Every structure is written in structure tokens, then in C-alpha cells.
Amino acid sequence: IAHVDHGKTTLVDCLLQQSGTLDRRSAGAERIMDSNDQERERGITILAKNTAIRYGDYRINIVDTPGHADFGGEVERVLSMVDSVLLLVDAVDGPMPQTRFVTAKAFARGLRPIVVVNKVDRPGARPDWVVDQVFDLFDNLGATDEQLDFPIVFASAIQGIAGLDHEAMADDMAPLFDAIIREVPAPKVDERGPLQLQVSALDYNSYVGVIGVGRITRGRLAPNTPVAVVDSEGGQRNG
């Protein structure tokens, strides 16, 4: 989550490429998650989209969200699907109006952000000042002590590098991957109960039709499992 143009989609591209998730056809492509024609034309993310990457023994689910204020509802909709957020902040600009909006929404759900100070390679970058500004923002939003003790990763998504110290960067994004594994709690799910999944996003594939995307809160998914789809009015249909 972040203000528009602070580098979310570029970061996701970088994580996908460095994790080896992409096939050879997609390697080196830009704005991989922005498949919508309007998004590619305007160069911004409009719809929130999810993907998963493998890193070592872990599967990390990632949702790329819009930063433009006009599409803030997309951010709210998908926060129910995640256990933490990467809050990207530009190393020159610091927190911006939409940074405050998305952070407040994350706090409202009790999430503890990992702060990613992005674009540390920009001329005029002032990462230490940005960290202080983020702390002040969190404090003004009523963050808990745990949320105020936020982990920080410095990065340049365009160069594909990250580090815990902006003066001693690694040559890849491993410090960010490691921070995600270290800081983000595993999902709390009752695996033995009956299946329950809240659909937060819809996709479409010409082969399988409509795809419901959401978070499993109970049980397990298995092929050919009969399910009941319940709408917001309480109506039910079997599928």
C-alpha cells in the first residue's frame, strides 16, 4: 500500500522476478500485474490484484493495490485478505496524503506494517528523515506500541536491491523477503472445520469462467468439494 507513484507495482514486479516465479516469457516485463488496458495506457494501478510467490520453503501471497485516491475502495476491500502490509514511502517525498489514508485503513484492521523506504537511489534521498516522518504519522493515527515498533527495509525496486541499512544495501531483495517471513504472522485458520472463504475479488478466465478470490478462514480447499455460495442478502446456491 502507498501513495500513487511510490513504486508498489515496480516492487511487485521485482519480487516476482527475483523469486523465480515468472516464466521466461514474462521475465523482464514491466507492470506484470497491470493487465487491464486502462492501467497499461495510464501507467497506474486501478484494480487490486493478487498473486503468490515461492521463497525458500514459504508461499507468500501478495496483493498489489492502487495508490490513486479515486480507487481507495479497492484498498479497503482487500485488506481483509492479508496479515500485514508493506507500506511503501518515497525516500524523497516521505508520507503523502494517500499514505495517511491507506495506513489508517490498515490500522483499523489491526495490521502492523512493514515500512519500505523505496527509491533510496533518487537524487536528494533522505531516508532517515522519511523514517521520522512515518513514525510521526503512525503516532498521529493512534498506533499501538507494537505498530510504532515497525520494521524498516530500505529499497530501490527499480534496481532490485534492498537492505536494513540504506548505506549497506544487499545486491538483491533478500532483506525484504526475509523481513516478510520474520515479521508477518502466519494466517490463523481452523484447518479441521468446514470450509469457509470470503470472496474479496473476482477474476475471469475463458477456460474456467468466473473465479472467486478470497481468504480461507476455516477448512481446506480440495478439488470437487461441494460448496454453498452465500450472497450479502443471505441467499444461497450450491456450487
Where are these predicted regions, by residue range?
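A short, flexible beta-alpha/helix-coil linker loop
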Residues: 68-69, 120, 158-161
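P-loop NTPase switch module centered on the Walker A-proximal segment
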Residues: 1-89, 93-95, 102-103, 129, ...
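Hydrophobic regular secondary-structure detector
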Residues: 9-10, 114, 132-133, 171, ...
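Conserved catalytic-core segments of large NTP-driven translation/proteostasis enzymes
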Residues: 138-239
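Ordered, soluble secondary-structure elements with a strong preference for glycine-centered loop motifs
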Residues: 6, 72, 123-128, 163-171
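Conserved C-terminal guanine-recognition region of P-loop GTPase G domains, centered on the G4
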Residues: 79, 85-147
